[in-house]
Amino acid sequence: MNYSPGYKSRSFVTTEQIKNMENLGIPPDIYNDPKLLAATLLDIWSQSSTTVTRTGACAVCRSKEGLYHAHLALYSGNTTTLGNVAKLFGDAHTEPQLGGKKALSDYIEKKPPYDEKGEDVLYVTGLENIKDYSGNRSDLENIKALLDEGYTPDE
């Protein structure tokens, strides 16, 4: 599903690939070390606001095909837009969190049924920060953002 960059939430899921890491200026000696990469990505998030607490979890993985990447579950004390989060992480693929704590924890750790792609989980940190998704009533804000971007009510 495609989400508007103006979509507002307090919780997001991001997939960070090497291209995104390079967009952020993270050098290979950092991003090739799963523990350093996870710490760097979570530091970027936690330091991105001086007024609210931002926490998260990170799993660094390698796909069966050899694609090295990281999954992030990100939480903010205030709402922010999907576009802001994606930009903060080098234009990484970002979506709002829609599932609960158990489902997202299982996804991050690639437990069944999320192990179907045969990814190797190289490092995980921050699982205690994963929260249950709590719906918000920002639907009108999200609809307004879509209309502002030129979408019609039927779309």
Predicted regions and their residues:
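Catalytic "initiation/cleavage/transfer" segments centered on a nucleophilic residue
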Residues: 1-47, 77-155
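Short coil/turn motifs at beta-sheet boundaries
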Residues: 7, 65-67
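Short, glycine- and small/hydrophobic-rich beta-strand elements in well-ordered beta-sheets
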Residues: 50-65
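A generic structural motif
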Residues: 68-76
